[in-house]
UniProtKB/Swiss-Prot annotation:
Topological domains, Extracellular: 26-303
Entries under Pfam families matching the protein: LytR_cpsA_psr (PF03816)
TM annotation in the entry: 5-25
Metabolic or biological pathway, per its Swiss-Prot or TrEMBL entry: Cell wall biogenesis
Protein name in the entry: Polyisoprenyl-teichoic acid--peptidoglycan teichoic acid transferase TagU
GO terms classed as biological process: cell wall assembly
InterPro entries, per database record: LytR/CpsA/Psr_CW_biosynth (IPR050922), LytR_CpsA_psr (IPR004474), TagU (IPR023734)
Length: 303
């Protein structure tokens, strides 16, 4: 499935500015206040005045999209991890979905574990450091979305339309095959199912991208949204990023054509139970190195 995704999870954020054009400027004050509230620098960047230069100079950048799970036994873990690299020089984008059970070193913890546990151990700062170490590429920016509250964003845009390729029931909601409309609660259940899908986590990642696309499509019609206040409130409550408002504007201006040439990358590996009885996803060193080389080339990283 060819996907035009998560640059516009700035769609969850910036599409309110991006898609709305002149209309968005009529509510500039509300949008501006929201974007100031969602801004949360990484600890490593708080004394770094050069953190935003890559965007302003139209250099290749990377973004970690992190979906945080706030329910039950998964509370405090990252439910989804995607790395997006953007190169405005050749107008291209690559999106890497990282299986949440990937076994790797947790930077700052002194142990190896599932990559999604980094968030539980040390929040977004440890997640960024761990993903950087796993891929051996720099992560310039992050966008964190509270997946439990994501339903508020879906409802705020009036629900989303997706094409479902697998009939299943999850959390009391039945999803037929074909084109379906999802409310916020339904979208959350739709994106959480993986045990009934023979593709496992990869199938769930696909559904997450579909729902995100649906939000982006609705957000791009911002001028037709009468409840933009609800959208902004949902974003303010459920999204954090180290991107500033100016960087979002610059990204829209300088990077939007990257969507014209997008590539989605799945990480090859093997999942099985370890001696401790816990299921992990293992990525061969050779496969990881191939991925590292591809991303570093795309980001024009030479050191």
């Amino acid at each position: 499935m060819k996907k035009k995704i998560l640059f516009w999870v700035l769609g969850i954020l910036g599409v309110l500015i991006i898609g709305g054009g002149i209309y968005a400027y009529n509510v500039y004050s509300s949008v501006s206040n929201t974007l100031k509230e969602v801004h949360q620098p990484l600890k490593r960047d708080q004394n770094n005045s050069n953190v935003g230069e890559k965007v302003s100079k139209s250099e290749p950048v990377s973004i970690l999209l992190l979906g945080a799970d706030e329910r039950g036994e998964d509370k405090g873990r990252s439910d989804s991890l995607m790395v997006i690299t953007l190169n405005p020089k050749n107008n291209s984008m690559k999106t890497v979905s990282i299986p949440r059970d990937t076994y790797t070193e947790i930077v700052g913890k002194g142990k190896s574990d599932k990559i999604n546990h980094a968030y539980a151990f040390g929040g977004v700062d440890m997640s960024v450091a761990t993903v950087e170490n796993f891929l051996n590429v720099p992560i310039n920016y992050y966008i964190e979305v509270n997946m439990e509250g994501f339903k508020d964003i879906v409802d705020a845009v009036g629900g989303v339309d997706v094409k479902n390729d697998l009939e299943f029931t999850q959390d009391g909601h039945h999803f037929a095959k074909g084109n379906i409309h999802l409310t916020g609660d339904q979208a959350l259940a739709f994106t959480r199912m993986r045990k009934q899908d023979p593709r496992g986590d990869f199938g769930r990642q696909m559904r997450q991208r579909q729902v995100m696309q649906g939000v982006i499509k609705k957000g791009a019609s911002f001028s037709s949204l009468t409840g933009y206040g609800d959208v902004l409130a949902a974003i303010q409550k459920n999204v954090k990023t180290n991107l500033t408002q100016d960087q979002m504007f610059d990204m829209q201006k300088n990077y939007k054509d990257c969507l014209k040439n997008s590539e989605d990358i799945q990480i090859p590996g093997d999942g099985h139970k370890a001696a401790d009885g816990i299921w992990y996803y293992y990525v061969p060193d050779a496969a990881k190195q191939d991925l590292t080389n591809k991303l570093r080339t795309h980001l024009e990283v030479t050191k």
